[in-house]
From Swiss-Prot:
EC number: 1.1.1.370
Function: Catalyzes the reversible NAD(+)-dependent oxidation of scyllo-inositol (SI) to 2,4,6/3,5-pentahydroxycyclohexanone (scyllo-inosose or SIS). Is required for SI catabolism that allows B.subtilis to utilize SI as the sole carbon source for growth. Cannot use NADP(+) instead of NAD(+).
Family label: Belongs to the Gfo/Idh/MocA family.
Domain of life of the organism encoding this protein: Bacteria
Changes seen on gene knockout: Inactivation of this gene abolishes growth on SI as the sole carbon source, but does not affect growth on MI or glucose.
Matching InterPro entries: Gfo/Idh/MocA-like_OxRdtase_C, Gfo/Idh/MocA-like_OxRdtase_N, NAD(P)-bd_dom_sf
Biological process terms in GO annotation: cellular response to inositol; inositol catabolic process
Keywords on record: NAD, Oxidoreductase
Pfam families: GFO_IDH_MocA (PF01408), GFO_IDH_MocA_C (PF02894)
Any GO molecular function: NADH binding
The name this protein goes by in its record: scyllo-inositol 2-dehydrogenase (NAD(+))
Species whose genome carries this gene: Bacillus subtilis (strain 168)
Associated pathway: Polyol metabolism
Source lineage: Bacteria, Bacillati, Bacillota, Bacilli, Bacillales
Swiss-Prot/TrEMBL induction comment: Induced by either myo-inositol (MI) or SI; SI is approximately three times more efficient than MI.
Length: 342
């Protein structure tokens, strides 16, 4: 493909709008030509703001537009499966936010359609593109810490999402911890074989009606013999706190920092520094790089480093952790999955 990839962003909530802005400002291999959102007036508003000629209040209509090469799907997760299938049937290259869907059956059906039509499907596990995680991956693969034997990660959000989001999110293991499941698999180069999910409501009692929790822990085991634990929290009023450690037989790698800037204030009150305020600030570069990677894959016919197959595996782990939490028992996973060809 010689020209810029002609993209449409479908779904213009917080993250969809963010992707749209990044496509306009930070992805030279792509051109945003259309935006779509069913909320009356939203698509037109964003189109005018970003200088986009096409907009639609029917995202499905956009999937049939022959002037669009690729779609960035940031609609509610419950719509992902159907939109992926229709996009693939119309020959659109696909970038879709995580999770791929909320059920394994839907994810497998979407992946089958992607395979059948031969389109690209990249999923928004942006931590793989973050420079710190990418550097850690390079160093682990180079053997700098020996054999990786333990992953420890935590994701702490400033507060709980709105009730309407919680209701349709799939729960903390699928919505939040799934990022750690993905990056743990990626960094260790191993598949998760067992999960034990635990959780409690510590600060947000409204979550009980949705069967969700605001503090969760997943103990994980890998087919390489490694193990790990993943913490997820909806109570981090001091800022957006995402860090990880990989322990190896010859050393450890620490990933992430709380610091927003490399500035420390010393005074009679003590020492202080600004903390990263939100996920867009922490992962801005990663969000741009993942879209640049997607555009490069579309232009050159390459397979993305994170695909619908990865997303289906991550979802399977998230569902298993959720079931383990609810049933109080560990859940075993079969790494020889038919849908992966492993």
């Amino acid at each position: 493909m010689e020209h810029q990839v002609r993209c449409a962003v479908l779904g213009l909530g917080r993250l969809g709008y963010y992707h749209a802005k990044n496509l306009v400002t930070s992805v030279p291999g792509a051109k945003l030509v259309c935006v779509g959102d069913p909320l009356k007036g939203r698509a037109e508003q964003v189109a005018r703001e970003l200088g986009i000629e096409k907009w639609s209040e029917d995202p499905y209509e956009v999937l049939e537009d022959p002037g669009i090469d690729a779609v960035i799907i940031v609609t509610p997760t419950s719509t992902h499966g159907d939109m992926i299938i229709k996009a693939a049937e119309n020959g659109k290259q696909i970038f879709v936010e995580k999770p791929l869907t909320l059920s394994l059956e839907e994810s497998k059906a979407a992946s089958e359609k992607v395979k059948e039509t031969g389109v690209i499907c990249q999923v928004g596990f942006m931590r793989r593109f973050d420079p710190a995680y990418a550097d850690a991956k390079r160093r682990i693969d180079a053997g700098e810490i020996g054999k990786p034997i333990y992953y420890k990660g935590f994701t702490r959000d400033q507060g709980a999402p709105p009730a309407e989001f919680i209701k349709h999110s799939g729960g903390i293991f699928i919505d939040c911890s799934i990022h750690d499941y993905d990056i743990a698999r990626y960094l260790l180069g191993a598949e998760i074989t067992s999960v034990s999910g635990h959780g409690r409501i510590l600060n947000n009692p409204f979550m009980e009606q949705y069967g969700d929790v605001d503090q969760a822990l997943t103990y994980i085991e890998f087919d390489s013999g490694a193990a790990g634990d993943v913490e997820a929290s909806r109570t981090s009023p001091y800022g957006h706190d995402i860090r990880a450690e990989v322990i190896g037989t010859e050393g450890s790698i620490f990933i992430g920092t709380l610091r927003h800037q490399h500035v420390t204030i010393l005074s009679a009150k003590g020492s202080s520094f600004d903390i990263i305020p939100d996920f867009q600030t922490r992962f801005h570069e990663a969000y741009c790089l993942e879209l640049q990677h997607f555009a490069e894959c579309v232009r050159n016919g390459k397979t993305p480093i994170v695909t619908d197959i990865d997303a289906t595996i991550n979802l399977e782990v998230g569902i298993a952790a959720t079931n383990s939490f609810r049933n109080g028992m560990p859940v075993q996973l079969d790494v020889k999955r038919a849908y992966t060809g492993m």
